[in-house]
Amino acid sequence: MAAIEFEGKSYEVDEEGYLVDLTQWVPGLAQIMANDEDAVLTDAHWEVLNFLREYYEEYQIAPAVRVLTKAIGKKLGKDKGNSKYLYELFPYGPGKQACKYAGLPKPTGCV
Amino acid sequence: MADFETPEIKEFIGIPALQEGSMAHSSPFIAYTDHQEALGYPGELVENWQQVALDKMDDLRSRYRSFQVFLDSCVKCGACTDKCHYFLGTSDPKNMPVARQDLLRKVYRRYFTFAGKYFPKLVGAEDLTEAVLDDWYSYFHQCSQCRRCSVFCPYGIDTAEISMAAREIMDAVGKGQKYCNEIIGKVFTVGNNLGLPGKALANVLEGLEEDVEDDTGVAVKFPLDVKGADILLVTPSADFFAEPHIDGLIGYAKVFHETGASWTLSTTASEAGNFGMFIGSYENMRRVSMRIRDAAKELGVKRIIFGECGHAWRIAYSFLNTLVGPFDFLDQSYPIPQHILEYTWGELEKGTLRINKEENDHMTLTFHDSCNVARGSRMGDYPGGQFDYPRNVIKAVCNNYVDMDPKTTKEATFCCGGGGGLLTDDLMEIRVKGVLPRATALKSVVENEGVTHMAAICAICKSQFTKTLPYYGFTMDQIVSVHQLVSEALVMKGSEQEAELDGTDGDDTEE
């Protein structure tokens, strides 16, 4: 399996670049993963990633799209509480791309 | 990410010029050892895999008479060749249903028929080699088991059953598909395909209660694990997570609320989907189904209703009683199980729901028949009910409705391109190419009839369309759930919408 090297440590990732051992996640990994997709993480991205981390710690899964948009809307204003805004930040899909950077498991199933 | 060419969308669905081997590179990720073992399969390719595969094939033909008949009866008439959406989208001749079947049939002939044993070349019989196994893995994961080809086959050969058997054989030798097998494992450990734990499910449902109350002023409940409720609703876990699925879930809840139904969801049976069917595994399909029976018993419900999920409804309608019946503990005066559309249409017919169709006037709808509902089940008590019920409900809540080309609807419907366990990112190319026939039919009604939105009743269809139709110039939000339309038009008693309509809200609204 592939691995990411970061600060002298090796992190195993799966075929799509998701972290295999989720407990290993450190914030610095997010930008390393984003580099592969030519993305530069800004504060706006980190607002989302931080929320994902908090939600995951409590519920052991990524939030539903609706839960995420509602939370972002509450925090950053109504104009940003929609999937359009999230797709601008994470064009490959907020659920999947953002989850990868934040070290969350990939949502599976009919989604 | 997308390093393939999106096919050109034309005015009509045409037969493409053949491009041999153009999809031979398409293969899904292989299941990990732990995914395999959790389902009772070997963790990796076993050493004597040829013998294991042939033994499994022998076992399957003795268990399923249909499988044997399908392998024997093809006369190569060619009626199926241009009926598969994956062939039409990829131009790869191995995606012609007959060619797909022959990948298995040639091995069957070699080892199980007289002619194939002694004169293999004369009858197209071939040895089971590693190259053949690789071909199986590739092309049996380019079949969504939608059964469109079988409608046109004069012998009724069902490629889906052959494809399911092939996957069962591959699982038996230790070469399973990651997407399906990982997900089935999650159903056993967490309770649903998504891996959504009970606490998270409760959080989603609470959030929805808040949202609906904010929108309507009515306290609509989304009950979870309520013992003694009348109805257990079993719905795809995507309904708790994805868009536009979740808008459909809101629709079910509003309908239940408005009709005064006592209902509940279950954390242990929080999934209608059953990928055991996709991998052709009776044992896994049964084990997944058992959760529903167990939950129904434990909660003491009288009825089971299924939400908008295509293959779940095929299993529910056609197989559930065989798999985990009898359901003699349920109220026998209702269909066992029942589809949410049967429930909603029944209530609309009775007149218990007040509808303001104008709420959906900004849209012109069309409807995508899901393959497993169209060709593997029924709604109501007459043939073809599964085509009428969704359309009846849409027309009852929307003023503007147009059907797509009849060659692409009802029993001739095209698969969305993501069914049968292919709804995974590692198969994006085949998914994008496979949606081409549906996209073509949709484009025609968009351009000629002013259609703006397409409604669907399957979680896979909804996800597949929102991800792949944008490759052809459509937008994600053009896909809607049928119960989302119901939700928009339903005027609940005591709601803000009711007050506004009746002019009793005290506001000076102009419109």
PLM regions and their residue ranges:
Chain B
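Iron-sulfur (Fe-S) cluster-binding segments and ferredoxin-like electron-carrier domains
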Residues: 82-110, 151-170, 378-381, 421-435, ...
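Ferredoxin-type iron-sulfur electron-transfer modules and their immediate structural context
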Residues: 1-138
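Iron-sulfur-cluster electron-transfer modules
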Residues: 61-71, 101, 105-323, 503-510
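Cofactor-cradling patches in redox/metallo enzymes
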Residues: 156, 240-330, 374, 378-385, ...
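Short hydrophobic beta-strand segments
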Residues: 230-240, 363-374, 455
